[in-house]
Amino acid sequence: GLLSVLGSVVKHVIPHVVPVIAEHL
């Protein structure tokens, strides 16, 4: 369902977002 797709997107996005946030901290 839609939630499954959202979950997959989140799991793919988080690993890319975390390092970017860490660089700015």
Swiss-Prot record:
The modification Leucine amide is found at L25. Keywords: Amidation, Amphibian defense peptide, Antibiotic, Antimicrobial, Secreted. GO terms for biological process: defense response to bacterium. It is found in: Secreted. The keyword Secreted applies. The keyword GTP-binding does not apply. One of its GO terms (cellular component) is extracellular region. Expressed by the skin parotoid and/or rostral glands. Antibacterial peptide, that adopts an alpha helical conformation which can disrupt bacterial membranes. Each caerin displays a different antimicrobial specificity. Belongs to the frog skin active peptide (FSAP) family. Caerin subfamily. Contains two amphipathic alpha helix regions separated by a region of less-defined helicity and greater flexibility. This is Caerin-1.5. It comes from Ranoidea caerulea (Green tree frog). The lineage of its organism: Eukaryota, Metazoa, Chordata, Craniata, Vertebrata.
